[in-house]
Every structure is written in C-alpha cells, then in structure tokens.
Amino acid sequence: MKYVVMLGDGMADRPIPSLGNRTPLQAAYKPYMDYVAAHGACGMTHMVPKGMPPQSDTANLAVMGYDPKVYYRGRSPLEAVSMGVELAPTDIAIRCNILTLSDEPDYLDRTMIDYSAGEISNEEGKALVEYLAERMNTEQLELHAGISYRHCLVIHNAELGTDLTPPHDITGKPIRNCMPAGRYGQLLSDFMVRSSELLRDHPINRRRIAEGKNPANSCWFWGEGTRPELVPFQELYGVKAGVICAVDLLKGLGICTGMDVPFVPGATGAKRTDFAAKGKKALEILDSGLDLVYVHVEAPDESGHAGDVECKVEAIENIDRHILGYLMDNLKARGEDFAVMLLPDHPTPIEIRTHSSDPVPFVLYDSRRKRAPSAPSYCEAEAEKTGLFIEKGHTLMKKFISLDF
C-alpha cells in the first residue's frame, strides 16, 4: 500500500461574486479531486485547535498527525532547521520577511504593501539578506538567508515573549500599531527601521523599481519560537515517509519528523511553481522505497494572500492534473494499491487575503474499494453536506494510515 497526502495550502475559500458565488474549488476543473471525493470518505475538519492562530505551521503539524497543543513551538525554528541553522536550547528563531512598505519619511507612517516584495527571486532575496547580515549581525542577533522573501533571525541567549504580527495579516494597512512589542519589541523595531535605511538605495531595489517591480525595502519579523522535539513519523505511524515541498517551513517539519526531504528543481513556493516537477518527484520517492509521500503546494495560499482569484483556480487545476492525477494514473497503471488524503491545511479566503479559522474539506480515499460518506464533487459545500466532521484534525493521519475510515 502506498499513501499520498495531497495538501493544497490555503486551498479552501468562501463564495466569490466574480465566480458566480462559487469558491475556487467549486469553479476549478479538477476531475481527480472529484473522483476521490465520490469514491472516498469526504467531510470537514479543523486542523488548527481552537484558540490557536490559523497558521500553516500549526495546521501542517496537525495534518502530519501531531497535536499542535502538545508539539507546537513556533514557526521560525522549523524554517531555521531547513536552512541548516543550528539552534541552541536558549536560542529564539524569528521569521524575517523582506517585503514592501510604502515610502513615507517616518517609518511608523508606512503601510504594508506586499508581504513578499513581488515574490522576489531566491537570488535577489539571498543577496539582500546577506548584505544586511554583513552590516547588522551582532553576537546577539544573527540574520540567515532562506529563499525568496522568507528568511530567519536568531536571537541568542534569549527568551520568548515578543508580540509579533504576521505581515500577510495586514496587507494594505498601516503598520504603526503592528510593530514588535514586548520583550524584544524595541530591539526588533530598531532593526527593521535600520534595515529600511540600508535597503532603500540598494542596486537590486533600484533595478526592481525601474522594472516596475515592488522593492524589498524593509525587514519584518514574526513567528518566534524554539526548536521543537518531535517523535519521528516512522516511529509514530510505522511507515517511511517523504515530503515534497518548496518552502522552508515544510522542509523543516520534514527534517524534524525524520522524513526524507528531497530537492525539487523548479519548485519555488510561488503562485506559479513547477507543479509537474513535484508530481514526478513524488512518484520517484515512492519508487525509492518510501511508503508515504506528503506533497505540499503553496500556490493556492499565495494566490489567496494576493487576492488573485484566477491564479487560485489555476493552481487548484494544476495540482489536480500534474500532481494528484499524475500519481493516481501511474499507481493505477501498475496495479498498485494506494490511499489518498486530500485537503488544505486552512482556508485563505480571497475576500480577506489572510488565513481563516473555518473548517476545511477533506477526503480519505482507498483505491481498493469505495468508502462513505462520499460527495459528488470535492468542495466546501459538498463536504459539509455529508455530515462527517472531525473536530481534532491531527487524528486524521492515524485513520488514514490504518485505513480506519
């Protein structure tokens, strides 16, 4: 038996007027998703426990079968692990976005324009962060380059207790009341202001402005935490697993849970990633002897944050055709028994351009026989109609692997 977890980050949504009051899942042409919904157990679940913010770190931890209330230690440490950053028990890791703010003279008067600086390239992002690190790193503060706009700051010999706001939650809003506060609030605020002074006239940003692109004109900190201690996935569930992803968060989760984390050429974590490359690599690692592949695609989430309806529908269709469909067709052609868990981690509604705590639709599919309750298509409304609701989303993985559904 082979297991496929197909996760479209932020794929769930709310009805959108421009789509005829349908969601992107309802509007998309996705025959493979609809097939597993019609032949599997389809319902709704909460991946993020009540009282916790609906972020991808807590949600993907739950999808992998780990209770966030027990195991969650923050987002940035997972990303730091993926970057190869060694974290001591007394270190705090903090996510650092390089992003676009408006250009008022007073930093506090600025507005959050673009949390990703126009999905800045890996090469440009790395160059800018290394430029800042050379000028701003100290014995206490260390900036580390990741990919695109996603980077990491480590505070050594530190404690938790700083209030930080995710930048994608405040797109188009003033930043004055969203600055770091609490234990290291002033330290991080000063770092952000200084970063904007250094980045303002950097050649990369001058070129981006000339090309009509958003400049990466400031750092922004969020997602503090300490390195988690996670029971290995194979020890917990008895199967060997790998994760196919582009973002450091998921790579870090894979590393911390003992999964294989192969490099996927062309996988960017952006709105228009190489979907086919992910499908091919997923099949490749299943062929290498692994039992389970966890395929994470960031594109629907990025589209939701950008408010890009067309791109979100397109991302869902590409996931269906180039990843889920590719895997199902190849496994069926071989006569291989397989199971599919299909779901988002959380919604990223176009309407609000950030994550919501709404439940998400899921499917558990077994290629050997039809399961119930099924749905005629895979979407939020049809999944809700089945009446199947799993309150604790982290329990789905055990049901999936044991085929107890």
Task: Specify the residue positions occupied by each region the protein language model found.
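Feature captures the catalytic ectodomains and active-site-proximal regions of enzymes
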Residues: M1-F405
